[in-house]
Amino acid sequence: METCLFCAIQRGAQPPKGGVLYEDDLVYAHHGDFDEGPTYLGHVMVETKRHTPEFADLTCDEARAVGLLIARMSRALKVCTGAERVYATFYGEVTPHLHVHLTARYAGTPAAYLRWNVEDWPDAPRGNADAVRALCERLRSALAAAGRGEI
């Protein structure tokens, strides 16, 4: 779809700072690039390749692929960031292309910043494009290790 942000990212028109974390025929993952300034480190987007708005529209193969990638990427985020928890959120309101936000929740995150406003914590780990690229390289390595059964 021409105007869809995630379709544009996947076809290379808007490449993510950290590059592609994972891609196959059904799913795609990249680190979120939401801010002009320092980026929250550990916010990964898992998307369907096919432009489809919600879970109810998935084929069984797509649903399996999304679920498996969420699990693998969550483990990789915990290993690479030291996160205590990885939040998975889906709203489907702004961009009608199925995507799940995986967000690392770091140790010491105050209770006021738990759940949906975790990225508002002023002391949360943030970084420039180089820091995002470095984290993404570690995430790709962790995903490769997971594929070999190492994590």
Give a label for each model feature.
Residues M1-I151:
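HIT superfamily nucleotide-processing domains
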